[in-house]
């Protein structure tokens, strides 16, 4: 769980340090070429971004983690490579770049001023500026809403200025918090008078054919030192080890590109898919269940999960849905490769206790999340029927964000069911004074299903249960 008291310490394992690598960390901006686009005073600033990028480069180049079982030792002195780098370079194929380039008109692709403006952005972050401008012009849009996750907001003003100049439109940067693809806020964009919306950094959970306005999803593929990732896996595992590879959408293209060179060394590589997500993609609430092929417990032949990405939130999802599989994380920014652990038994106990307490309640509150598209009216209808059939009284509350202090104001509510983010209950449910159940837990509490021995992570799965978005 996200609380540090419930997570065992990570174990940092063999990490290859390469001080002579072709790193694709965002470079500093070329100061010899000045783009013609006029950057507004609200713009974050090239100098600030360049300084951050330079500091990140220095941190990655100078820090190496040595092999240990319980502690992490770091050194800031330059060291030599401890592997032999292969001559074959790994090709990273961006998502549909070649096809998109063939479709975008030459007057956009070859616009010198536009190309100079795009150089302000990090070269290894694919914001698909050319495609965005082309789509906006195709749609004859006048006002464009731009929605970014927190980690990309620092680039929002640059992108806004570029789009306004080269697409001749007005832009709106939507500053409300965006936790994931479920937070696509097309309703607000429409109410603000936008006729086109660009959502950055997440996959298409909300199909463009059901959104309220014309939409474009930009996944923001991030390229990094892929060769280091490949060599790290080869350095740490035997050729017979079965690898199950997953990532977030930003690194999905790189994950696919790594498959071919890794297959030359490992005999069994598997990239799972939990539809409607892309192959290898996982969400914090949705991950595939891995089918075991080695029930005899032979550790060398068992599957292991390799997660490519920073942070633990998404990784914990596939760990929860596959508690018997070892999980490793490769951070593409720090180049640290670590064995990750999770206290499943404590999580099970906390959530079952909450369900047991809630089962005795007579007055429920149902929270329909209004942050983007988090709340599902279909799930709401299903839970209302369950509550009625169990003779429970309930009140429906609309909330964009859920905090303990806010819910404490509803003193007559004995238990809550939130239809927003399942992980909110799992990770932070203990912080609320009254039980805060997610739809799956409510299903168990109200007798719709028995407690599952493996906690389901299927909230956006096409094969999910009655408590999920795509249930039939």
Curated annotation (Swiss-Prot):
GO biological process, one term: protein histidyl modification to diphthamide
Cofactor comment: Binds 1 [4Fe-4S] cluster per subunit. The cluster is coordinated with 3 cysteines and an exchangeable S-adenosyl-L-methionine.
InterPro entries (alphabetical): DPH1/DPH2, DPH1/DPH2_1, DPH1/DPH2_2, DPH1/DPH2_3
Cofactors named for this entry: [4Fe-4S] cluster
Enzyme class label: transferase
Binding, [4Fe-4S] cluster: 182, 285, 421
One Gene Ontology term of the molecular function aspect: metal ion binding
Pfam families: Diphthamide_syn (PF01866)
EC number: 2.5.1.108
GO cellular component: 2-(3-amino-3-carboxypropyl)histidine synthase complex
Family, as annotated: Belongs to the DPH1/DPH2 family. DPH1 subfamily.
Function statement: Catalyzes the first step of diphthamide biosynthesis, a post-translational modification of histidine which occurs in elongation factor 2. Dph1 and dph2 transfer a 3-amino-3-carboxypropyl (ACP) group from S-adenosyl-L-methionine (SAM) to a histidine residue, the reaction is assisted by a reduction system comprising dph3 and a NADH-dependent reductase.
Entry-linked NCBIfam families: diphth2_R
Protein name stated in the entry: 2-(3-amino-3-carboxypropyl)histidine synthase subunit 1
């Amino acid at each position: 769980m996200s609380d540090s008291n419930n997570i065992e310490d990570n174990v940092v394992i063999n990490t290859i340090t390469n001080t002579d690598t072709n790193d694709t960390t965002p470079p500093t901006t070329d100061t010899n070429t000045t783009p013609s686009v006029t950057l507004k005073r609200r713009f974050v600033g090239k100098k600030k971004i360049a300084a951050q990028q330079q500091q990140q480069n220095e941190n990655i180049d100078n820090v190496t983690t040595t092999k240990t079982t319980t502690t992490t030792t770091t050194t800031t002195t330059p060291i030599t490579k401890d592997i032999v780098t292969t001559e074959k370079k790994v090709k990273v194929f961006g998502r549909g770049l070649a096809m998109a380039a063939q479709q975008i008109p030459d007057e956009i692709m070859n616009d010198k001023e536009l190309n100079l403006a795009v150089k302000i952005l990090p070269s290894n972050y694919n914001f698909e500026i050319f495609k965005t401008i082309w789509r906006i012009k195709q749609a004859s849009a006048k006002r464009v809403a731009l929605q970014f996750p927190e980690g990309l907001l620092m680039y929002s003003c640059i992108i806004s200025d570029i789009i306004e100049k080269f697409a001749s439109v007005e832009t709106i940067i939507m500053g409300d918090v965006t936790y994931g693809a479920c937070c696509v806020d097309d309703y607000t964009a429409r109410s603000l008078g936008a006729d086109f919306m660009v959502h950055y950094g997440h996959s298409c959970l909300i199909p463009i054919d059901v959104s309220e306005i014309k939409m474009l999803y930009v996944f923001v593929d991030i390229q990094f030192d892929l060769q280091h990732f490949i060599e790290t896996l080869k350095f740490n595992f035997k050729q017979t080890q079965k690898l199950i590879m997953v990532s977030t959408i930003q690194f999905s293209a790189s994950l696919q590109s790594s498959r071919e060179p890794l297959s030359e060394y490992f005999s069994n590589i598997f990239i799972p898919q939990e539809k409607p997500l892309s192959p290898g993609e996982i969400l914090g609430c949705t991950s595939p269940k891995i089918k075991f092929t080695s029930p005899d417990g032979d550790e060398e032949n068992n599957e292991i999960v390799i997660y490519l990405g920073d942070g633990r939130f998404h990784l914990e999802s596939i760990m929860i849905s596959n508690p018997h599989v070892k999980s490793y994380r490769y951070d593409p920014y720090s180049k640290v490769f670590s064995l990750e652990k999770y206290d499943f038994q404590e999580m099970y106990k906390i959530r079952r206790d909450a369900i047991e307490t809630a089962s005795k309640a007579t007055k429920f509150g149902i929270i329909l999340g209004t942050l983007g598209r988090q709340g599902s009216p279909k799930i709401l209808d299903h839970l209302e029927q369950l509550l009625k059939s169990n003779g429970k009284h309930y009140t429906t509350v609309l909330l964009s964000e859920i905090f303990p202090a806010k819910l404490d104001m509803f003193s007559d509510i004995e238990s809550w069911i939130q239809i927003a983010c399942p992980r909110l209950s799992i990770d932070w449910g203990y912080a609320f004074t009254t039980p805060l159940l997610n739809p799956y837990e409510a299903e168990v509490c109200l007798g719709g299903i028995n407690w599952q021995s493996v906690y389901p992570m299927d909230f956006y799965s096409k094969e999910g249960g009655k408590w999920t978005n795509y249930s039939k």
